Amino acid sequence: MKISEEEVRHVANLSKLKFSDDETTEFATTLTKIVDMVELLNEVDTQGVPFTSNVADNINYMREDVSVAGWDREQLFKNVPEHEDGLIKVPAIIDEGGDA
């Protein structure tokens, strides 16, 4: 199944991505090869092969909940550029003023 360059551009546009013409051509070629390989699975004869939903025997294995000591705060803060009141200080990413 051939993936067209137009389809690549359409999906890129929906994803807010921009590609050069060369990149678009390369993506179309690569995606076509991937889809062709996946379509080969349709040719596999699975008649008589039992359905398998899970091959692991240890379904829902839960470990014991054990409390352990955490990290030493002073040791952790050695690599932190800025901290305040025992918390790591990071740059603001949301402007508190104006409309969102």
Swiss-Prot record:
It comes from the Bacteria. Gene3D superfamilies: Glu-tRNAGln amidotransferase C subunit, N-terminal domain. It is an enzyme of class 6 (ligase). GO terms for biological process: glutaminyl-tRNAGln biosynthesis via transamidation; regulation of translational fidelity; translation. GO terms for molecular function: asparaginyl-tRNA synthase (glutamine-hydrolyzing) activity; ATP binding; glutaminyl-tRNA synthase (glutamine-hydrolyzing) activity. Keywords: ATP-binding, Ligase, Nucleotide-binding, Protein biosynthesis. SUPFAM superfamilies: Glu-tRNAGln amidotransferase C subunit (SSF141000). It catalyses: L-glutamyl-tRNA(Gln) + L-glutamine + ATP + H2O = L-glutaminyl-tRNA(Gln) + L-glutamate + ADP + phosphate + H(+); L-aspartyl-tRNA(Asn) + L-glutamine + ATP + H2O = L-asparaginyl-tRNA(Asn) + L-glutamate + ADP + phosphate + 2 H(+). InterPro entries: Asp/Glu-ADT_sf_sub_c (IPR036113), GatC (IPR003837). Its EC number is 6.3.5.-. HAMAP family: GatC. Allows the formation of correctly charged Asn-tRNA(Asn) or Gln-tRNA(Gln) through the transamidation of misacylated Asp-tRNA(Asn) or Glu-tRNA(Gln) in organisms which lack either or both of asparaginyl-tRNA or glutaminyl-tRNA synthetases. The reaction takes place in the presence of glutamine and ATP through an activated phospho-Asp-tRNA(Asn) or phospho-Glu-tRNA(Gln). PANTHER family: GLUTAMYL-TRNA(GLN) AMIDOTRANSFERASE SUBUNIT C, MITOCHONDRIAL (PTHR15004:SF0). Heterotrimer of A, B and C subunits. Belongs to the GatC family. This is Aspartyl/glutamyl-tRNA(Asn/Gln) amidotransferase subunit C. The lineage of its organism: Bacteria, Bacillati, Bacillota, Bacilli, Lactobacillales.
